[in-house]
Amino acid sequence: MSESKSGPEYASFFAVMGASAAMVFSALGAAYGTAKSGTGIAAMSVMRPEQIMKSIIPVVMAGIIAIYGLVVAVLIANSLNDDISLYKSFLQLGAGLSVGLSGLAAGFAIGIVGDAGVRGTAQQPRLFVGMILILIFAEVLGLYGLIVALILSTK
């Protein structure tokens, strides 16, 4: 096995896995959040069809999680080259896992809170502000992963 001047031939594999992890895990979280809160919207809209547009917020917030993963995956993919060092590729893997797994967790939280919040808001409209605050805290979990990933990938 030959080594280039910067690292072994297989070094780029870890960077590619970081880009893949960023996109796959954040998209899984976004898909779960969208599906879970979407079923709550569908159930709520039977009783209160006038609240459909107001209740779409959890679905939008879940979709933003996938954008975080896309941003990091594109940054990692753009930094790939033939002579990437093993150190740099492990940083890229860490960045991808950071944003991906935090996006997965945030997507799950947004889906569960969005589903329960939308159904509860249909019964008691005063719950809307509380639901939005909890959704913001869930979204911030994904944002923390994005910040760490940006720091790691630009090192």
UniProtKB/Swiss-Prot annotation:
Changing residue 53 to R: In EPEO3; uncertain significance. GO terms for cellular component: azurophil granule membrane; clathrin-coated vesicle membrane; endosome membrane; extracellular exosome; ficolin-1-rich granule membrane; focal adhesion; Golgi membrane; lysosomal membrane. GO terms for molecular function: proton-transporting ATP synthase activity, rotational mechanism; proton-transporting ATPase activity, rotational mechanism; ubiquitin protein ligase binding. It comes from the Eukaryota. It is a multi-pass membrane protein. It is found in: Cytoplasmic vesicle, Clathrin-coated vesicle membrane; Cytoplasmic vesicle, Secretory vesicle, Synaptic vesicle membrane. Changing residue 95 to P: In EPEO3; likely pathogenic; loss of function in proton transmembrane transport. The record marks 139 as: Essential for proton translocation. Residues 1-10, 77-92, 153-155 are lumenal. Ubiquitinated by RNF182, leading to its degradation via the ubiquitin-proteasome pathway. Gene3D superfamilies: lithium bound rotor ring of v- atpase. Signal peptide: none annotated. Changing residue 131 to I: Sligthly decreased function in proton transmembrane transport. Changing residue 137 to L: In EPEO3; uncertain significance; unaffected function in proton transmembrane transport. It is linked to Epilepsy, early-onset, 3, with or without developmental delay: An autosomal dominant neurologic disorder characterized by various types of seizures with onset in the first months or years of life. Many patients present with febrile seizures and later develop afebrile seizures. Some affected individuals have global developmental delay or regression, impaired intellectual development, poor or absent speech, and motor delay. Additional variable features include hypotonia, gait ataxia, behavioral abnormalities, and anomalies on brain imaging. Proton-conducting pore forming subunit of the V0 complex of vacuolar(H+)-ATPase (V-ATPase), a multisubunit enzyme composed of a peripheral complex (V1) that hydrolyzes ATP and a membrane integral complex (V0) that translocates protons. V-ATPase is responsible for acidifying and maintaining the pH of intracellular compartments, and in some cell types, it is targeted to the plasma membrane, where it is responsible for acidifying the extracellular environment. This is V-type proton ATPase 16 kDa proteolipid subunit c. The lineage of its organism: Eukaryota, Metazoa, Chordata, Craniata, Vertebrata. The gene is ATP6V0C.
